[in-house]
Amino acid sequence: MQIAIALVAAYLLGSVPFAMISSKLFGLADPRTYGSGNPGATNVLRSGNKKAALVTLIGDALKGWAAVFIAQRMGFSDNVIGLVALAVFLGHLYPIFLKFKGGKGVATAAGVLIALDPMLGLAVAGTWLFMAYAFRYSSLAAVVAAAMAPVISVLMHGGNGQTVVVGILGMALIGKHWQNIQRLMAGQESKIGSKKKA
């Protein structure tokens, strides 16, 4: 029963839509109505409000980190902690509070990885930052970082249970970016910092 409660709580925490909350706090339009339509930090940045985007980024990352950190402190096994990590991530992707239409999961995945293994999380975040700086496409950076995450995990820890969780997170994140991948291939993807479209 305790495990079930932990998983439900993690999912509900993941469902908290910080993009919506920060947009309301800063008097912005619903992020689902402009840009990519994605309720995430990159799309909120398209509103031109960097503070709102930062609040969204921190909030989304923090909920992923908090769910795993609390599960660790409660003494759950590694397998259960892995399930909690997946639950909070899926909560962000398919939030009950937004009719199961959530964000892409980049910030939440980063928070999860940092809680699971700080060095792994920082390595993956570093991959994202390098790609984002070099090419100015958040989606490309996310896809490359997601693909590299399980590879980095294998190099650091071998094919253990954590690597399986990281692999599932990576595949789900890439899947959520499928339309972005198509736009990248067509040369139609918006770059980081581009303003919202009317």
From Swiss-Prot:
Signal peptide: none annotated. Pfam families: G3P_acyltransf (PF02660). The chain crosses the membrane at residues 1-21, 52-72, 80-100, 112-132, 139-159, 161-181. GO terms for molecular function: acyl-phosphate glycerol-3-phosphate acyltransferase activity. GO terms for cellular component: plasma membrane. Its main location: membrane. One of its GO terms (biological process) is phospholipid biosynthetic process. The keyword Transferase applies. Probably interacts with PlsX. Belongs to the PlsY family. This is Glycerol-3-phosphate acyltransferase. It comes from Dechloromonas aromatica (strain RCB).
